[in-house]
């Protein structure tokens, strides 16, 4: 079954379930979902999945309990609850085994990385949002978040990661994994969201470009593009290492520059300034500063491309797709006091940064969770915006 068919089946099932729920069945499912999550987290914490042989082999519960050093009775209860999600299975003779789904979280390193990050880092933040709201109320401070509550720190998310190499390693692995494996956020969607060929020979500035995945992809696909990767010193060193392994015809068109996007943009009059999954990490006040730094460097024909989520209006489309986007919106709140934005919020953000900045187009490629917002400077403020 391909992704489109799978998504359609899941959506229809979700809609049917919503229609037939009553308060009792709703609460029963709600509690079960919480238990299911915590059981999967327990399995990950004690490395249970790695102690189960690959299909079609199976193993006695007692043997897994001994290997993982966990109580047998707890292992049985936890594993059997996890099975109600479709993860793992039990043979007719009462042994524990992987099924097709659970085996992929062992054999596929990207799926394993994402599972571990979600259960260890993402979901625990949900419990901190109540405490953060009670403590700080209406705040946009990046160090007054659910993340601060859960980790007991006064540092912002990225500053705290600098002090915790273990968390930083997991976060970086998760981001790289999503970029290459998660169909909704795969960097390749950028290729189809904008007419790069129409630029001809052009300069593209990849702001916050990290280790260079986006720039390398663009340089490989479009031989007339020259790229500049901008980021802080540490990720820039990673980009240098990656570029050293590339063919000369690609790396010769990629420049690397240490840069803090809260400072003036050093590259003037570039054809494209690209912000890919950057602005959703920042509250409006900080996002405006980032955009203003770019606007000051833009020429009359420069384009600002923002690749980020554009939230749908509530109930305007697929429930499951909307839920997937809104859980990421909440993660932005919990980590940064930032947000994913709707079209009108993007329009307002750009206008606050500079009234001349007008949206020309918004494109979400098929299968992508992210949209590409194209904006240019318009010296005629009275002219209507794209939408």
From Swiss-Prot:
S-adenosyl-L-methionine binds at residue 231. The active site is at residue 280. Signal peptide: none annotated. GO terms for molecular function: O-methyltransferase activity. Induction: Expression is repressed under acidic conditions, while the expression is induced under alkaline conditions. Expression is induced in presence of sodium nitrate, and repressed by glutamine. Keywords: Methyltransferase, S-adenosyl-L-methionine, Transferase. Pathway: Polyketide biosynthesis. Disulfide bonds: none annotated. GO terms for biological process: methylation; secondary metabolite biosynthetic process. Its EC number is 2.1.1.-. It is an enzyme of class 2 (transferase). Disruption phenotype: Leads to an alteration in the product spectrum, with an accumulation of 6-O-demethyl-10-deoxyfusarubin and 6-O-demethylfusarubinaldehyde. Pfam families: Methyltransf_2. It comes from the Eukaryota. O-methyltransferase; part of the gene cluster that mediates the biosynthesis of fusarubins, highly pigmented naphthoquinones responsible for the coloration of the fruiting bodies. The non-reducing polyketide synthase FSR1 is responsible for the condensation of seven acetyl-CoA units to yield a haptaketide. After rings A and B are formed by aldol-type cyclization, the PKS-derived product is released as 6-O-demethylfusarubinaldehyde. Belongs to the class I-like SAM-binding methyltransferase superfamily. Cation-independent O-methyltransferase family. COMT subfamily. This is O-methyltransferase fsr2. The lineage of its organism: Eukaryota, Fungi, Dikarya, Ascomycota, Pezizomycotina. The gene is FSR2.
